[in-house]
Structures are given as structure tokens and as C-alpha cells.
Amino acid sequence: MASAASLSEPQVLATAKRRLFPETDESDAYAVADTQFATDEWLPGQPIPDRIRAQLAPFNHVRIGSGYPDLVGVRQLDSSLLAVDRFGDHPPLIAVEAKGYTEHGSVDVERGIVQAYDRLHEANAAYTAVPAAAVSQSNRALARELNVGMLGITPDHSVEVLETPRIVGNRAPDEAATIRFQASAQGVADKSFGLNHPKNYLAYPLAIYHEAETAEVLADHVVRAVDAARTGAAFLNLIDDQPSGPTVTALGAEVIRFALQRYKSVDAALSVFEDWQGSRSRFYDVAPEWGLLTRRVVWAYPATQLIVSELQTMHEDGITTPSLVDLVEWLHVHHPTFTIELFIRGTDDARQRVLDVDGDLRVDALYDGEVYHSPTVFQLKAILYHAGILQTRGAEPHRLDPETEKWNLCNPLTARRLE
């Protein structure tokens, strides 16, 4: 029998994650492990190796069903892991419950199956991952009956697919929807709004529409950081960035129509972009019509709507000049999973500092700018500033003072007039 340390629950979960969510360049895959696995020690006297924590990162506390699965993610799984070949056009939401050897040498396989079954009320597929040697025929029969996939982990950390689940159609709750958001082209997981001026993103569909080569057009007229502009344009849903090359979305096409209506040609529109190079003035003030278009584009970005809605609610509750710390504390109460994914870096160190093993917020850590996710507190905030939504631009994490960094709406509304 494998030792408790070699097939403890974190070891089992890390092996299962490598099988379900291998490290690839897939753009529509993302997974988080529960915050309990960010602890230094799992079994008494047996620390979790750093490499295992690194494999399990990032960490978050995501509620699915009546509890918090050990691992939750989104990915198109291969046919060997499912009882059907595919699941429509969207990758399924997957929940995993792991069980390993305890300090007494036992494995509660049945509990893992039942916990995974509970996640099926909101996930599309659920698995339990357990040491293969601990699985009985009755365990497998129960998993089949409850439509729970079963992954058997061997002493050499290979994976045996013992039972495959059928995909079920569930509407994901708000917390699970955050994981879907991170797995989409608009998620901020391991990517970046690399540029902090919206003109660089608005120009990308224009460059595609131009007869000349896209990268050359963008570099000549707008910005030389072509890859960063392309990534940001995809985040804002202006383009669909596929391996075969980017194409213009419906929203991006509207940007092109807007430019043609005002300038009659793409070349004429791009010549105006040259005048804005190096400008630090608010885009909304320098070019009001483009500022309004930016506002429309950035409002379609899911994170914007939630941030603005919660800032408005904070204003109504008397928090009229919220700091970054105030905002993150507030958001974590109402949208905990979203808050961590959007505002906190995905590294093991940052998540471990900000969240305890139960997923509760360690507020003291929020006063250190280094724990924050730059694409949100710097680039996204700058875009919201240029669009006329926020009063101040963002700052890079190493220059950030979270206590004095304000997130004020430009035009907060009076609540009684909305009723």
C-alpha cells in the first residue's frame, strides 16, 4: 500500500488536476483548488511539498451545491474522461472531490462519491479522485449509480479512469460563473491588459479591416506593442482571437462603422489615432465621441458592470470615497469568488496571504499593493478612467498604496431618484 504521505489528499488532487487540466495553451480552460490546500501541512508532521502547492494553485473558495469542492474548473475534456464525446459549444463546469490516505491509513471513498454527487446540482460533471488500491466494486457501483466519475490514483501518480460521468445541463450560480468568466477570452487569469489606454484596443478591429497587414498598420499608426493590443482587444470582445488569426466580432464591427461614419475611411480614422500617441489626458475629454464609444465597449465587459453596480451601492450606503481596500472588502462579502479572481494575483503566495484555509479574507494583507492583480488595479482602472466612469486612473502594484487608492464613480446617482 502506498504511504499516507505519497497519496495524501493534496497529492491525489494534484495528480487528478494534471489529468483533467493539463498545462496547455488552451484559452478556454481554467481551474482553482480550494483554499484549504494552501496550508503548509496536511497530515500531522507531513508538510505539503511546495511543488504540490504550485501544481494546485491558484486557490479560491468556490461554493458549488451545498459545499466547496476541492477543485473546480472549466475545460473541454477528452472522450476518455466522459461517457459522451462532447458537450455542445461550451466547455463543462467540472467539480472534483479528492480523498487520500489519512494518518490512520484509511480512505473514505464513499464520502468522496457522495460529496461529488452533491456538486452535480450546479456542475456539469463531477469526479472523485482516490487512491486506486482503496476502491472496491461497491464504490464503483455507487459512483455509476450517482453519475460520478472516478479517477484512481496509483502509487506512481498515474491516473486510471475507473468510471466516466455523463454531462448534465445545469445553470451555473454566480460563484461558478466566475470560473467560466476566467476560462473565457475575457478572463484575467494568467493574462493581462498590457496597455492602459483604450485607443490601443479600439484600433485593433480597424487594423484588421485595413487592406494592409494588421500588425504593420497598428505599429505604424497606433502602438508598437501589437501582441498586447491584440490580447486586450480580445478581452474587450472586439476581436475573436483564434489560432488561425483574429477576426472582428459584432462589437468590433460597430467600432469600424463608427470610424467610417465620422472619417469616411479607415486610413483617415487611424491618422487621428496618431495624434493621441503619448497623451496622458483623459480620452473622454480629448475625444468625447471616442470616449463615449469606449464607455459602451468597456460596459459590455462583465467585470465593469459588477464593479460599477457595487460602487453605486457603496455610495448609497455612505461610502462615498472608497479606497481599494474598502472596495475589495465590500466585494468579497457579496461576490467572494469574483473578487479574488479579479483583484488578487493568482500566485500561491498572494492567495495564501489574502485568504485563510477557510476562504475568509485576511484584511491586513490587502494593505500591501503587491498582492493585487495588475490588469485590474492598473490597466482596467485606467480604461475606466479614460471612459469617464472612474475619477482616477490606476497604479502599478509596486507603486500602489491600497489605503489611499480611491475608486470613485464620476457620476454616482441619488438612490431615491431611481425608485
What kind of region is each of these model predictions?
Residues P173-E419:
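Donor-sugar nucleotide-binding helix/loop cap in glycosyltransferases
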Residues M1-A14, D368-H373:
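A short, highly charged nucleic-acid-interacting micro-segment common to nuclease
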Residues V96:
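Conserved beta3 VAIK motif of the Hanks protein kinase fold
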Residues R144-K191:
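Mixed-charge intrinsically disordered linker/loop segments at interdomain junctions
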Residues A116, N139-R140, R230, K381:
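Short amphipathic alpha-helical segments and helix-helix/interface helices
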Residues G100-T102:
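Conserved protein-kinase N-lobe ATP-binding Lys motif
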Residues A4-E9, K17, F21-P92, D108:
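Active-site metal-binding core of divalent-cation-utilizing nuclease and nuclease-like domains
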Residues H104-G112, D118-H157:
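Nucleic-acid nuclease catalytic cores
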